[in-house]
Amino acid sequence: MKVATLLGERFKKAPADCVFDSQALMVRGGYIKSVGTGLFSFFMPAKRIAKKIENIIREEMDRIDGQEVMFPVVMPGSLWQESGRYTSIGSELLRFKDRNGIDMVLGMTHEEAAVQLARDAAKSYTQYPFMIYQIQTKFRDEPRSRGGLIRTREFTMKDAYSFHTSQEDLEQYYAKAYHAYDRIFARAGVPQVVAVKSDSGMMGGRVSHEFMLLTDIGEDTIVICPECGYRSNSEAADCIVHNEEYPIEPLEEVYTPDQKTIEDVCNFLHKSPLQSCKAVLYQRNMDDSLVIVFLRGDLEVNETKLRNLLCAEMHAATVTPEMGVCAGFIGPKGLPEGITVVYDESLKTLNSFVAGANKENYHYKGMNMARDLGEVKYDSVAKATAGGICPVCGKHSITISRGIEVGNIFQLGTKYTESMNMQYLDSDNTLKYPIMGCYGIGVGRLIASVCEVSHDDYGPIWPITIAPWQVQVCALRVADENVRRVADKVYEDLKKAGVEVIYDDRNISAGVMFSDADLLGVPLRIVVSPKTLERNAIEFASRDKSFKADLNPDNVVAEVKAKIAEMIAALTPED
């Protein structure tokens, strides 16, 4: 391949709407082109990277006995009606009717298709366990596509589905898949990806992990304990806080004119937000019924946990007179009947605190939950905070980081096999529902994530295992016959030896050539110039500037192949 005929223009500057480094560099470098919101075409370099990542994934899935299959992108709505997700998933699932008026969907995941494929093919316990997987296009109508390939609407994903006859067997396979993911990310050049406990969301199941690339630009919040290694997505993390023991005070109603926020009322009463209770109001989407969450004044509601607790989608409440509550002065004592009330565990040991009195311009101080409200049920619905207590080791060591989710794994249980009536005949001659696991990796997002953590000011620095080419040959002052002869020979020799090589033989300045080479991010570079040939050598260097050497033009292939093997070995994990 020659740079002169490589489609895709390279730019000095990125468009103003690029929000992440990876997005800017991939646009500047001629990797991707936007077609519409969250929709991208791939030029050759990006496609080659994607194919290499897919091959790594394929090798690791085959290594744990995966069977590669292919599902359709378009599925009948009736299939999703079987599982219940046709109505339970919102507008991110793209629905349409075909010419015959039949409801159809564009697949955003393929659990339904996997069960439909397997339920008529795996009727006996002797066929279990098994795992099927595909690497294929998905469409999710994201409301906030952004960041280039970080969050798109159409994307390529590896999705795998395993089927088991026991929970123990699922857990054993889940561990294998977990290890396979570690190998995939290590081989792709991002061993810093970590697994975190996660919320299963619409996928269902009780056990799930997300694989996160820790980076400041990540959209996900990660809760980490550096003391014991506990890691969780904030959506699934428990918030455990310590409450000070305050002197017991009598319950007293106090006048707090126009003090409607926690900050206002605490300043007015000379109290800390840690000694206060705040109310956060929601309404259920289905009927607009009111939900009030009470938690310690310095904390925030974990809306994922709240949604899971109440099994309902919700939105921020719009308070109306008919609700019977006093906005800005709402508290747990004296609420009207018929309101769903959730008490966070942060209030369980809090005493002598400030709370709304459910009366215009009044608050209580000196409130005590047990004394003033009696026995109530507490739930964990607050977001974990930095400095909080680790749920595993019990130390005040929680830190908060950001991350990009590049993969996920779930123990689904029988959610889909039961709803879609997939059964097998067990050894005791009874019909049972298989237990499922599912395992996903976003290919495009992984490309962008690698670029996000492996670049400099000049362009991407692709790991050797996924780079679009392994070596770039640059011929400087190609009009020089000696330069042309040597550079052409090096290029042809490397090609014949099976090295993936791209050749820049354009008659351009060294500055432009090296700038384009940096944007292509090829990990190894050979420079042939009159200056190097004066010393009967060519320059051999790495894109990351970790090494640089002169090579004898007659011994290029052996040296280059040895270096490639060394770099690949450095990214290959031990079994």
Give each language-model segment a name.
Residues 491-559:
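C-terminal structured "cap/appendage" subdomains that terminate the fold
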Residues 111-116, 144-158, 168-439, 443:
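Extended, low-hydrophobicity, polar/charged segments
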Residues 1-98, 156, 161-201, 298-299:
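TRNA-binding/sensing appendages of the translation machinery
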Residues 87-104, 213-224:
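Acidic, His- and aromatic-enriched active-site or binding-groove loops in soluble protein domains
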Residues 265, 437-466, 470, 565:
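C-terminal, non-catalytic macromolecule-binding modules
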Residues 38-43, 156-165, 210-212, 406, ...:
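Short, hydrophobic beta-strand segments
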Residues 459-513:
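Generic long, charged, amphipathic alpha-helical segments
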